[in-house]
Each structure stands twice: as C-alpha cells, then as structure tokens.
C-alpha cells in the first residue's frame, strides 16, 4: 500500500510538471509566432502609410509661404483668399489619398499649438477652425516637427478619435532664411489593422488554451495508463514474493 501511494504521488507530480512545461512551451511558441506576425503586419501598414505621407508632403512642400502661417490664426481668417485656396488643396489631396486628416499647425507666441488649415470638409463634425488647440496625443509629434525633424509614428497611436498612423513634416520659409514656420501633419486610419491584430491575438490565445487542454487530457490518459501498468507490476511482484516464500 505504501509503495502504491508513493508511486501514485510520483506519477501525479511528474504529470503536473509535464503539463506545466508543455503549457509554457505552447504559450511561448504561440506568443513568439503571433508577435512576429503582428510586427510584420504593422511594419507593412506603416511602410505603406509612410509612402503615402511622403507623396503628400512632396506635393505640398513648395506651396507654402510665410504668410500662410503668419496671417492665419483664428476663425476670423477662414474668409481669407489664401486660406480658402489652401483648404481646397488640402481637402482634394486628402480625399485623393484616402487620408483621414491633413492639416497645418503652428506654435503661437504663448507656446500653444493650434490648427491653421484643416483639410476636412468644412461641414464635417470634427473640422478644426483656425486657432483650435491641438489634441494632446499629437503634441509630441508636432513639437519634433517644429524642431526640424520629420516624424513618423512607427506604431499604432491610440487616440480618443481612434487608432491612427501619423506623420509630421517641418515647413520651412521659402524666403531663404531657413526658418521653421510651422508643420504639415497627416493622420491615416489604422483601425482595420488594429482590429485584425486584436482578433489574431484573441485567436492565438484561444488556440493556446485548446492546445493546453488537449495536452492535459492526453497527459491524464498517459497518467492512468502508467498508473495501471505500475499497479500490475507491483501485483505481479507481490504474487511472486508470496509464491517464493510459500
């Protein structure tokens, strides 16, 4: 009886350890595969958006003058001919490239970042009038652009208005001074990419759980089989010992 209990405990311990090891291996392998797949999908989406953003910037880079950033600062300026012209250009370009948002930005004398020309339709619910404060999620990217750097978000940016890719470009004055007079920014929708990645993560998690359950069932079957074999061997040995002692 003592031997049976000892063997029984040993088999249980080995089975539990085996299940844990297999579970960790399955989870680890699934995590690595899923991470690599997600990174690949994200890199492809970001590269595609970068290419689109660069094309927009190339088209617009030589169309700005200092006046576009100095003379526009409030809602009162939407009637200016220059504002109307730029707004029309950005609106057409945004629609052509399926870009979600396309706009110009500047920093005011008191250090605030504000919208200037928004490329959305004028009757859009989220159209930003000149002078509207920039959302905090975009501040870091715009600040870098205003320092002279071209900035891309190399990941999905989670904002209050959705999951996006953003690119910001410094706008230099065309008068030869080299002054950074503002920034041209654009945002591409990443909602579909984010949804696919989340769905894939959930699917991978469920597959891992199913695999672990299957391994646990198989391990239990093996445990029962081994326990039975051990019991048979002990019974045979005890019968042999009895026969010898008789």
Per-range role (PLM):
Residues 5-36, 209-220:
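Extreme N-terminal signal-anchor transmembrane helix of membrane signaling/transducer proteins, especially
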Residues 91-113, 207:
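Short N-terminal helix-loop-first-beta-strand/juxtamembrane motif that initiates sensory/input modules
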Residues 119-157:
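Extracytoplasmic/periplasmic sensor domains and loops in membrane signaling proteins
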